[in-house]
Regions:
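Active-site nucleotide/adenylate-binding loops and adjacent lid/helix of ATP-dependent enzymes
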Residues: 17-24, 34-36, 45, 95-96, ...
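Conserved N-proximal alpha/beta basic substrate-recognition cap immediately N-terminal to
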Residues: 25-132
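Short, surface-exposed charged micro-motifs
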Residues: 204, 261-263
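Short glycine-rich anion-binding loops that position phosphate/pyrophosphate groups of nucleotides
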Residues: 80-82, 160-161, 278
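Phosphate-binding site of ATP-dependent enzymes
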Residues: 165-255
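N-terminal amphipathic/basic-hydrophobic helices that include classical n-h-c signal peptides
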Residues: 1-15
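C-terminal active-site "lid" helix and adjoining low-complexity regulatory extension at the edge
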Residues: 253, 257, 266-305
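Protein kinase-like catalytic core scaffold
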Residues: 154, 191, 213-214, 260, ...
């Protein structure tokens, strides 16, 4: 009987679906929550870093640490990690290669790239009739200054940025002009977005598999205008209006994400600011008790049956 049980146990382990979770920080809250949610749905989570990935072309091997990436049934991209231009290109190449091998990659490399590139996402929002603030992206100092004059007050962001890092709010005055020139000289390119007067908060909406999972207000700390939770913002429960629901679902659909965090600002109307293709689930869990990672894990389970 004992031998039979061992055989059954080994069979169960061998047939359990293996789900890779790409993280940078192994202690990341969302990464750990994804592991628990994957286990909850009877699958095996395998945490790895794309920053440690290796491809041996003659041998036909692709692995990260001790994990054979080609043996996975699916990959959830929680984080690509900081990287150089060559490095990030290689990481996307790996994800594309896994897709070609028939391994489900969530979110898809294409949708992650669209979401990560603020220029591309802003362009796609406008192209598809989604309200988004006026935006100018340019290598030209004169064009940048002209945009600042037009907007009066603007937000300057890195095209590829996260967690509110490197974001500046500038006015059309001497200080703002100097800051804009400084950013242009430093980066060679500026992404300038019209500042939308708002109630001191934005809305983060979580969408999974074309369904609204939950939403929170992200409220800027006193003395700041940046709402990101990683920059000291506070999460509070939010009930969406029908228009905000429509905007969120449309934005996710246009970018092509399976799961995402859509950021909306309340001004004279609702605007989609940007979309996060690798959002944290911590804020909405602490504010509302919503476990976004369970929705993601359930989608993965159903998609690889």
């Amino acid at each position: 009987l004992k031998q039979a049980f061992v055989k059954y146990e080994n069979f169960h382990e061998d047939t359990m679906k293996k789900i890779g979770i790409s993280v940078t920080d192994p202690t990341d809250w969302t990464g750990l929550a994804l592991c628990n949610s994957i286990k909850h749905f009877g699958m095996e989570p395998l945490v790895f870093s794309l920053g440690e990935a290796t491809s041996k072309i003659p041998a036909g091997k692709l692995y990260s640490g001790k994990i054979d990436l080609m043996a996975l049934d699916a990959v959830i991209v929680r984080d690509l990690g900081p990287s150089t231009r060559n490095d990030v290109s290689f990481r996307f190449d790996i994800l594309c290669q896994l897709e070609e091998l028939g391994i489900a990659v969530i979110n898809s490399p294409e949708s992650i790239a669209r979401a990560a590139n603020k220029y591309v996402s802003s362009y796609m929002f406008r192209k598809n009739g989604i309200a988004t603030p006026g935006t100018v992206v340019t290598n030209c100092v004169d064009e940048a200054l002209e945009a600042l004059v037009s907007f009066g007050r603007a937000v300057v962001k890195p095209v590829f940025g996260y967690k509110g890092i490197g974001v500046e709010c500038v006015r059309n005055d001497e200080k703002g002009i100097l800051k804009l020139k400084e950013l242009m000289e430093k980066n060679g390119l500026v992404y300038i977005q019209e500042f939308i007067p708002n109630p001191g908060r934005d809305i983060r909406v979580f969408v999974v598999n074309n369904e609204l999972v939950g939403s929170i207000y992200r409220i800027a700390p006193e003395g700041s205008w940046i709402n990101n939770l990683s920059q000291g913002g506070t999460a509070k429960p939010c009930i969406l209006t029908p228009e905000q629901e429509k905007l969120s679902l449309r934005a996710s659909d246009v970018i092509g994400t399976t799961y995402s965090g859509v950021d909306i600002i309340e001004g004279d109307r609702d605007y989609v600011m940007e979309i996060n293709g690798t959002p944290s689930g911590k804020g909405i869990f602490e504010a509302c008790g919503v476990e976004v990672t369970k929705n993601i894990a359930e989608y993965v389970r159903d998609s690889i049956k």
